[in-house]
Design a protein with these regions (language model features):
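Cytoplasmic-side transmembrane-helix entry/capping segments in multi-pass membrane proteins
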Residues: 40-49, 75-76, 99-110, 246-253
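Hydrophobic alpha-helical segments and helix pairs
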Residues: 93-142
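Membrane-interface interhelical connector segments
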Residues: 160-182
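Hydrophobic transmembrane alpha-helical segments in integral membrane proteins
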Residues: 1-21, 143-147
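Interfacial loop-to-transmembrane junctions
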Residues: 236-257
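Juxtamembrane boundary at the C-terminal end of a transmembrane helix
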Residues: 261-276
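A generic, lipid-embedded transmembrane alpha helix
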Residues: 47-63, 113-117
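Structural signature of hydrophobic alpha-helical transmembrane segments
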Residues: 9-20, 69-82, 215-226
């Protein structure tokens, strides 16, 4: 069982990674309260984000190196998802002014990392994952991560629109990109996320022997429901001009269904019923 890090080093790196994530969120919070130069803010936040993501990647690689496959326990999977979310955020931040999202994304990433303290040897799985099935898993993780970013984005759109309608936008809102840009980014992320979710479902139907088998039937049904919600939202956007709170509510609905599909049963089995 090869290990990249000892238990103590793994735990130390976990704490350092969480501190880096929180530092990035703290920089955004401080700069939103002060009149700090935007370029300086972006540089500091991105530097902290890159350092945190690098450390986070090492921790995930350590978990992968144990079993030579993606760790299947709840906390390891949660950490992997938030690593992908953080990487997607960083990639977007280099081309779009979305660094304010760090104030929500990074604290969740820090929590996901900290929940793995003492989990340097993640649980094994008895399922034989061939390369085709691993493609399905990777597509599922990336699509879920992208749609998680969309859910975070929807929170900001909701807050921004409500404060603008009240005609008393605070300093927080003043530091955000325009509402039009925020909505445009939201629907771009939703479009790519839905495309990847479509591929994830398609590969599941192709590569899984029985995608409606008892132990994964709920995941399939909830994922299809999420797909229908997101597809309807994008149709409503292009055909009926849906935006604002309607778009936010549909995003929340689709994401809630997808969250139950990905983590609902795993949470109940591993943390409530204490089963592997």
């Amino acid at each position: 069982m090869p290990m990249l890090f000892s238990d103590s080093l793994f735990n130390s790196l976990t704490i350092i990674t969480a501190i880096l994530y929180v530092s990035g969120a703290g920089l955004v919070a401080v700069n939103m309260l002060n009149n700090t130069i935007v370029n300086k803010q972006r540089q500091l936040v991105l530097a902290s984000a890159l350092a945190a993501a690098f450390m986070h990647t090492l921790l995930v690689l350590h978990s992968y190196n144990i079993n030579q496959m993606i760790a299947n326990d709840f906390f390891s999977m949660l950490s992997l998802v938030f690593l992908v979310i953080s990487l997607l955020f960083i990639a977007t931040a280099f081309s779009q002014p979305v660094e304010t999202l760090a104030i929500i994304v990074f604290p969740f990433s820090a929590i996901a990392v900290l929940l793995n303290i003492g989990n340097s040897i993640p649980a094994t799985t008895n399922v034989n994952l061939d390369s085709a099935l691993q493609v399905h898993i990777i597509l599922s993780i990336v699509s879920y991560s992208l749609l998680s970013v969309a859910a975070f984005q929807a929170i900001f759109v909701s807050i921004q629109e409500k404060q603008l309608h009240d005609r008393h936008p605070g300093r927080f809102i003043g530091r955000l990109p325009s509402l039009q840009l925020m909505e445009t980014l939201l629907f771009r992320v939703l479009s790519v996320g839905l495309a990847l979710l479509t591929l994830a479902l398609a590969t599941g139907f192709i590569f899984l022997d029985d995608i409606f088998a008892q132990h994964i039937a709920h995941k399939t049904v909830l994922s299809i429901l999420a797909w229908l919600v997101f597809a309807t939202l994008l149709w409503g956007r292009h055909s009926l001009g849906w935006r604002g709170q309607k778009a936010v509510k549909w995003t929340y609905g689709g994401y809630f269904s997808l969250m139950l599909a990905y983590f609902g049963s795993k949470f109940v089995l591993q943390l409530v019923l204490n089963q592997s």
